[in-house]
Amino acid sequence: MNYITSLLLLSSNTFLHPTTTYLQSMNDSIVLVTSSVSTELTTLGYDPISTISGVNGTNNIDYIKLLNDTNSTFVQLDNSDTDIDDSSSNSEDVSSNDEQIALMNSSSDFSDESDEGNDSDDNGDEVENMENNQANESDTQNENDRVLNYDTSSSENENENENENENQLEQEHQHYYYKNRSKFYNHFLRYPEVVINNNDDRAELASTKNNLLVRSPKSNNRRLIGSSRKKTLKSKSKSKSSKLKHKSRKSHKRRPKLLKSKDVETNEITTVEVITLTITKVLARHDLAAIVTPIQQHQSGHLIIGYPLPIATKSRLHGYYKSSGVLKEVDANPTEEYDSGDGKENTQQNPIPEKMRLPTNDDPYSLKPTHHYDPSATMQNPHKQFTNRTGNFEIPTNVQDIDDITFPIDLSSSDSTSNLYSILPMNQTNLPDVNTLSLAPGTGSVPPRYSNHHSEFTVERPPRPSRTKKRPRIKAKKTMKVSTQISSAMSKSIHITRIGSTSSGIASGITNIVIPNSSSSIYDNYQDSSSDKQPVSLSMPTKTITMTTDTTSEPVTITEKLDKPKFPDIFTIIRSKLLSKKPQETKLHSPTSTDTKSSKLMSSSSSNNNKPEISKTTKEYNQTQESTSYNTTKAVPKTSVVSSTTSTKPNDQGNNILNSFIQFTETIHSRIRFPTADDNNNNAGNNYHRRFTGVVLPENRQFVFRSASQNLSFSVLGLIILLLLLPGLLIIIM
């Protein structure tokens, strides 16, 4: 649809509404679909959006309903190879005029059966053009036979006299004619006063010879042309005898070269239609009144798609053109001139006749009760046929080419349909100027939706509707770094040294790291506690982990900030805690003395933070702690580690190192409160637990160490354990 809409953006100074769009090009025809809905169009029973099969030639569109819409206009343009400048300068030759009038004529054989076979147009040939022989047989008629007759009650001599006067006017001005594709038609373009009531008098109209229907039973095609007239027996015999004589001369003289093909019939006429179709049905179902004028025609043959035509439903859209051809400010209320009950309505270009209301005969531009037309009345005032309905008798001056069209279209909407479409409706009362267009009815402070620049045509996209079901979004994994800060009391006794240093020993400040039971971990307590509603963010206050030393009861606190967790740093710090720079002797102490000094994992369990109190005395890790006194002269000391077993084998010592690291990591992990979906915080639901790459916590609580880069295999981890066990192995050997 965007591609089709872009075809209508003809020039830089074109003002087009996006609802008007090219629909299709078929049989050398360009079909325009224009939104043109009256305020009472929903009562006509428009079906939902159906396939546009009637445009393709299958004639499935209910044209009767479309033609009941008084704004629907069917326009047929002659495709003769005449120059437009010739027609505007009144210097057109007779041959092109003969073919022009010949398109509107036919033999009386067709007109005799024009009121029969109304249901015989289902063969899909309505889209086709007139047959070539129809145009050829009427090309050889005399000038008295090349005119249009509108008086059915006059005699044949009166018809010939009237036809002579009209033929002289036809040589001065070339005009395009309407051609309807159904029995019921709407408006004439050149003869704006000849409008027949198409609402209730259909059976009466079908019986008259003034009907503009012509059917062709010979070719099994229904030919709907502008007019059908009575012909004399002389004209019938003359047209039949000269059919084959002038066939090749007239049929190929004025046809464009690009349209020459074997199928002469379908390439004879180019049709331009402005119809109400798909967009009309969409707008009608939502009670949106979109009112659009039919096409006006300039003297030179250019098309002016003008301002909305005042219709019988008392439309408030009755603006008029400025002399420059742009919109001019109009009143919000309809004037008395455009009232549906007033007879002045028929002074406009394409009036909509009331049911039985006919104007007085003193108006030269009014519709006569006998549908008689005086051609000299319109041709003496050629300007009025384009502009008399708009209230201004000046022809727009900006129409210089077919690409330069002033096309203001208004959508006057109800209050409930402003957000239903991608094309928001505009209100006519908010159009004091083209550059200050409003978005919605009644709002004057809304910025203009259309660009007021002449170099572009932009339409703002309306906000997309909110999704009812949110799609899952893949979030990038971000590694959380744990930065552990050691207090000053801790840093006094911890010295970081390299692995394998000859002077490495045990730090006097650390002999035991208290870890709670894994069976009843803090993480499970968080999951099971239903009373703990308030989440603890990652930027929670710092926690203190109190650990006791083996020599003194002075607690050593480690202050941790969980803003930036970094598990490789934890591994480095734990390793540095297990190693010491200065060799110091560690005295053996009994398990009973250690039990009195057994450490507790302290947490600031205040009611404000809703942190669960954790005051678990450790199971007697100190009973299993292995402390060895060694000689200070030994170059390679033995490292004492926290273990959970009583075994003193070197392999068990390596397992103790790994277990102590895993338990310490579990402690940190269990202290972290993950945000839930119920959090009011903006960071809730960001799945912070998925960003941990250091420790994987399966459901069976079997902790598996995994590095962030996942390159650290268990073989590398075993190599690290062997490096840590080398001092112990050397001591055992010695």
UniProtKB/Swiss-Prot annotation:
As for membrane topology, the entry says: Lipid-anchor; GPI-anchor
Q: Which UniProt keywords apply?
A: Cell membrane, Glycoprotein, GPI-anchor, Lipoprotein, Membrane, Signal
Q: Which N-terminal residues, if any, form the signal peptide?
A: 1-16
Claim: ATP-binding is one of the keywords in the record: no
Protein origin, superkingdom: Eukaryota
Which chain positions have GPI-anchor amidated serine-type lipid attachment? 707
Ranges of biased composition (kind: Polar residues)? 130-141, 620-631
What are the Basic and acidic residues biased-composition ranges? 453-463
Composition bias type Basic residues, residue spans:
228-259, 464-479
Where is the protein found, in the record's own terms? Cell membrane
The propeptide sits at: 708-734
Protein name, entry field: Predicted GPI-anchored protein 49
Species annotation? Candida albicans (strain SC5314 / ATCC MYA-2876)
What's the gene?
PGA49
